[in-house]
């Protein structure tokens, strides 16, 4: 019998501290940096984001999102036999945030590890979990994207500090006789490392290089709009489907312009795109599961519908997953 995997529950969590554009404008003005709500909205579509308190970690956010996903799936943490966390802002250098989350959930014993593909991280992690379930290596997996990007932002750079927020999203992925994950397509091109990175490191207890986020926005935009269409079409081809079969597009919530461009290339109305970037900002690996959970809980995404997830991020990494809810 062919074995498949299917999402049986979704969950998400945003830290309570909500920062509007006006809040950020006022903060930056105190540092002599000029920007405006209009400037941010016009270029990004972002109106607000959430920042975690100083003592809150990625695993803390992941814990809340995971509990909600487990509840939605009707299972307990002890039922898990795999945990994968996608994050670029781990609690520690090691052990993995997944191991820390596993302990907080009380799911000790199952394999747990992190995936680091920045904003493509959740798509990568979901693909790995699907492969492990299909091969018989797992039966019920928890796949999480969780980030505290506010820790690595340069608040002297108005072009980047307004873009990102903190949050977590999670799904429970279970073995199924009916196809859930239909196809996926992953890519990376390390020749573009410098256009989106945090170029710092730790050596002998000292920080080497720059520990804050750097981005060439124009280069990222140009590359993203091209590779996202290619990944989408490759994934659809693998599943024997076309643009017309997509009920919902859930892209990485980076920038409304990138999302609009991707939808246009796939001949999709924006009415078929789940958009949360306006309220959450770019939450990196958390953005896709956050948006998916939002779509499920507000009644947009219905059982049986076909959903295309797309991620693109530093590395440069990108990919897509086509699934049936």
Curated annotation (Swiss-Prot):
Q: Which GO terms describe its biological process?
A: fatty acid biosynthetic process; secondary metabolite biosynthetic process
Query: Pfam families under this entry?
Result: ACP_syn_III, ACP_syn_III_C
Identify the enzyme class.
transferase
Write out the ranges of the annotated region (ACP-binding): 253-257
Instruction: Copy the pathway line from the protein's UniProt record.
Output: Lipid metabolism; fatty acid biosynthesis
Write out the catalytic residues in the record. 119, 252, 282
Q: Give compartment(s).
A: Cytoplasm
The catalytic activity, as recorded, is: malonyl-[ACP] + acetyl-CoA + H(+) = 3-oxobutanoyl-[ACP] + CO2 + CoA
Q: Which E.C. number(s) belong to this protein?
A: 2.3.1.180
Assembly, per entry: Homodimer.
Role played: Catalyzes the condensation reaction of fatty acid synthesis by the addition to an acyl acceptor of two carbons from malonyl-ACP. Catalyzes the first condensation reaction which initiates fatty acid synthesis and may therefore play a role in governing the total rate of fatty acid production. Possesses both acetoacetyl-ACP synthase and acetyl transacylase activities. Its substrate specificity determines the biosynthesis of branched-chain and/or straight-chain of fatty acids.
Put simply, this protein is called Beta-ketoacyl-[acyl-carrier-protein] synthase III
Species the sequence originates in: Acidovorax ebreus (strain TPSY)
